[in-house]
Amino acid sequence: MVNDPPVPALLWAQEVGHVLAGRARRLMLQFGVLFCTILLLLWVSVFLYGSFYYSYMPTVSHLSPVHFYYRTDCDSSTASLCSFPVANVSLTKSGRDRVLMYGQPYRVTLELELPESPVNQDLGMFLVTVSCYTRGGRIISTSSRSVMLHYRSQLLQMLDTLVFSSLLLFGFAEQKQLLEVELYSDYRENSYVPTTGAIIEVHSKRVQMYGAYLRIHAHFTGLRYLLYNFPMTCAFVGVASNFTFLSVIALFSYMQWVWGAVWPRHRFSLQVNIRQRDNSGHGAQRRISRHQPGQASTQQSDVTEDGESPEDPSGTEGQLSEEEKPEKQPLNGEGEQEPEASDGSWEDAALLTEASTSALAPETLGSLRQRQTCSSS
């Protein structure tokens, strides 16, 4: 029993352990709440930047296949077609979302795959026309461009065939040319008359082609240029800006909720006290004004009753002062109670004192004059 530690030391150790455990739990809880708050703010920042990018950035490039059709109800003995090849291309996604954005400049081109056949080489120049239309099929813009195959001499064609003969035999290469026709260099969408489709027509009945594609590429300037060419840098700056802004809002909200010292409420309480003081002052004036007619009537009754005045020879000046004392005591009592109703402010007490003195002065002089006239009579 001699080696046992003293009881106060055990109690002190237990108290210290409880305090440290409480602090540790509190710190863990605070760090957990802080970590969850940071994750939430970061997720909201990423979501806001993604929403802005999706709504602000248009489609960079749109490629649509062009399927030409022509009439076949004519004499088929000739090598030419019955009509010019025509194609109708829709400029909407899934029939709802439009490809073009308002105010954004676009470069519209038509890519033609033409074989190097003798017919196309003898064809020369031909015309390609595009007509953009809006709802209801109304044409809003038309553009025409001339096209022809690139010239290649017979010697150059023979050398090209010999060099790429193995690739041509196994189908890895073809004797064709890809022509890119620029239909619009700076096409802008009208917000009031949106473009819903385009009609493409090739003005040649003898043209031979493998396929065609309509390509729409956006030309970015300003902020869109930065977002498109530097996506990672802009994403980091945008998310960091959103996170900083949201963090400041959360910090001010926490300070207002916990401390309540950022925007003190003394101004509001001061306004309330001023209003209460004004209301109490008006009430005191109304009570004094109600009390004045009663004093005048009592004084007149003292003078006219039995034709005797308060200054009768049987009376003394001490009696006069004693008659005035009951009249002053209620007013002094009221003046002492009014400051208590106005939250104990000395301004209300001064106001009521001035009002009481101004109200008593005329009555005292009038009563003295009446007493003098009665005594002289």
Curated annotation (Swiss-Prot):
GO molecular function ontology, one term from the record: phospholipid binding
Membrane topology: Multi-pass membrane protein
Region (Disordered): 279-377
Skewed-composition ranges (Polar residues): 292-302, 367-377
Residue numbers on the Cytoplasmic membrane side: 1-27, 264-377
Listed transmembrane segments: 28-48, 243-263
Protein family according to the UniProt entry: Belongs to the seipin family.
Name of the featured protein: Seipin
Compartments (UniProt record): Endoplasmic reticulum membrane; Lipid droplet
Low complexity bias: start-end ranges: 349-361
Modified residues (Phosphoserine): S289, S342, S345
Predominant cellular place of this UniProt entry's protein: endoplasmic reticulum
Glycosylation sites: N88, N242
